[in-house]
């Protein structure tokens, strides 16, 4: 942690900020944290209350429950195990559909490249008809090159919010869209 290099946080202007949502997975709630000098935390807290209305008391109580030791121990194994299983299932199916994968060993999504120069924009055109969509690679291009982007044939497929029971249906929808384009 960066904090080990700070002798006295209350005598500094340093903010150490993080988020605890990836491993704790609480639907509908995002939890972040800030470590800083007490005076800075008070100012930040005042702004949060004034500028954003603050966080509801039930949300605060729920957030505290998320950090109970037993829940954290369970989340540290259950979340990676679940995502690993989903990553493997979807990854195998995507490869069988002729997609190239550019994914790591963690996370809850796959980066895929469509075959034959097909664009993710065209893929979404077919997916929209089925009530589905993917995140187009061009939307992640920091240079905003649009159709000239080298990411035009890439898309991100997020399996994090999907129930395991939807797998067959998800793959069937994607397969129909890809077949229509290739």
Predicted regions and their residues:
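Conserved core segment of the aminotransferase class I/II
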Residues: 4-81, 176-178
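Conserved glycine-rich beta-strand-loop-beta hairpin in the small C-terminal domain of fold type I
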Residues: 64, 80-91, 101-113, 150
